[in-house]
Amino acid sequence: MSIVIYTYHNPYSLKENQELWNEIVNCPYFCVSQTLVNGLKTLYGKDFQIGRVTTVKNLTDAVYKYWTGTACAVKQHTDIDNIISTASERCGLNANKVENIRKSFLFNRDEVFNSIRTMFELRMDPHNIVEKYLTPEQKFIVFIFNEIINSTKNKDFVLKEDFTEQEIDEAVISALQIAKDNSSNASEKVVISEFDHIVIHGVHQFSPLMLRTIEEVAKYKKVILLFNYQEQYKNIYQTWIDIYSSFDCKMIDFKGNEFHPTDSSTISYEGNMLAQNMGKLLEGRKEDITVEKPYEIIEFDNMTEFAGYVAKIFEEAERRDPEHPMSAMNEQIYAADSSANDILKIYFPEQFGERQFLNYPLGHFFIAVANMWDSETNGILISDINDIRECLSAGILVETSPGRLASTFGKMESLFVGCLSVDDMLSRIKKVRKNKKFISDDKRLEYVSHISYYAVTKDEINELEQALNDLEELASFFYEDFEKRPNNFKAFYKKLKQYLQEEILDERDLGDEFIDIINRVLTRLDEVENIDASASFECLKSTMSLYLVQETKPGKSANWIVRNYEQIDGDVLRTAKDSKSQIMHFACLTDEDIDAVKTREFSWPLNADFFEVAQNPVDWKYQVFVKARKEYKNFKRYALIYGLEFNKGKYKLSYVKRDGDLEREPYYLLKILGIEKKRNIDRIINRKLADVSDIQIKDSSLGTYSMYDYYRYRICKKRFLFETLTEGNTVYKDEFLLAKYLEIWVENEIKESMQGLPGSELVLVERINEKYDELKKYFPF
């Protein structure tokens, strides 16, 4: 095995160490992330061409193409699902425990799937797992693992081994070619003069598949593992040494000058000094620390306020450069907790990658139909009326004009409260039609005109009725008797592909962009349509995000507005080119966000004890993987100091004070060094707000308004908009308001019919019950 580890000291001075530079400049080069690829290209230009340099993920995907493909994932899901569904007490647990664990495993299908794949990727031997140290859930997953190994399903989980040299060469070339094809410089000639070794740069979190790739490539080529190391900050960089020591191979440190900030006139000096002081603090050299003034840190009260701050920066950049807003941001934000993206995704969806097929109305249609289908009754079972709304809004079912079905359903939605099937809905529609037909009293017609589902036309009712029948028929076409058919996945994929091709692409007037997306979904379906697999309907539904997704289009990947700390190592190199205008903003600086690992180290139900107590293999890949997972808690601290140390521009620090009811303080190292909190709200409180108090409706048609219209306008302008300008009537749609309306209707008719008559409580109660029984037919829900 030919693996060697190199360390360097200064990322800006790789060229200065000629021996190291000569080894890495002409060979295939694989970085931990695309940001590191971009940073090296920005800093070193043509020496790091895209096409010679790409990501490690591209390499692993090329070496294990089938294993990382959709067909393999779907087949493995079906195998695992079938074993879970048929598990019994022979797994070593009592019947009650087996049933409970089966349910939890089926609910957490994706986690279980990832855990099983990890076990195969690490070549675990079930005989080396000590059962007495396992939890019941871990015993169950080991049982599944054993069942796969000892059955014909094993062939679906075999990773290719014993590659030939030609196959490895082809995989490396393929990975580089994919990167070149997806870049803007696809026509540039790329020269790789040395093919006998490769470089893998900056990896801290090694996956089992990455380690298998390194092992296979190292059989024929020298593999250089490269990372930055600062001897002056041994405690900070110990996390890297601990991981790379597990490779049990030669480690060579290419000496160079350690970085020390000396020029106080540079704009990056204060941030560089902060990194140095944090490093000295962690090295126990507190007496060497000098802090001229407290470091400023911005305080955001909550994550929403932080997201609002980021949104303003992004909007300004978007105005300057609508085509490339991310590069136009003068403040790049890196957060130890990047959940602000969940908020920003709502306001700037186009930034987070191409919209997936399942996020389009057509995709919502397939999700909604699958949610409603009940394989036990072999029909639609409505547990959430919103699924019906999604189906009617998708544009799949026939309607006179786009959106009319959704509009009709909106008027009639309260009628369907409590409906569990399409037949229930059709039955209530039938009652409404019958009631409308037999109302002859003008006064009663006036009363029902205020009930939303009586305010629909005959044509609208007929159209909705037909759509519901078509929906049931379409659901049956896809899913009827699904679990009774052999190779049911294969049959379903063929039907789905046929429907998308013949009923959607050929029959519908679609935009070019959506046609392109559907064609790429069909390409994905080509991968899986010949899978000989049978599993439960729930398994089919849970894998929908694997097969109903378009193939990735070059240039359409996500551009996260708030980046995580894994992106710092590459982006910091880009500050060397534009140091005056760039600000690196390090956010979410609390102990909870820096030191704590919010994501689990291992996928459920595996944990540290499973890897470290229940077994003790000596394989280096196993040791590296487990050590890397355990060391992730130290990575963010390293990344923060690395970013501050090598940043050539300005910097900002911030933290989010509240996480739910929990109040947090800034990161402890910053507090020790001395910080001054600046509340973000205080920075913006005096900002002048635009006057929006006098919003006018322009070019609106004038009409004659009744006394009731003026009354509505004075009480509630929103009701005036809906009832006078839009609907022309007061119509009640809400279940609560309709119940209240029935109460008032009964009261009014009783008062009118008993006016002037002697009354008694007994007679009154009797008349109320009679009137209620007479009128409740108008409220079938």
Where are these regions (language model features)?
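Conserved helicase core region in the C-terminal RecA-like lobe
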Residues: 54-59, 197-205, 331-333, 542-603, ...
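ATPase/helicase motor core of nucleic-acid motors
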Residues: 47-52, 61, 285-294, 315-456
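C-terminal, charged and often intrinsically disordered regions of DNA end-processing helicases
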Residues: 667-781
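Conserved helicase NTPase motor core
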Residues: 128-247, 299, 552, 582-584
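Accessory C-terminal helicase-associated subdomains
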Residues: 431-573, 741-781
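Helicase P-loop NTPase motor core
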Residues: 1-28, 33, 253-350, 371, ...
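Basic/charged alpha-beta structural segments of nucleotide/phosphate-handling enzymes
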Residues: 34-40, 44-192, 396-439
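C-terminal accessory regions
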Residues: 620-675
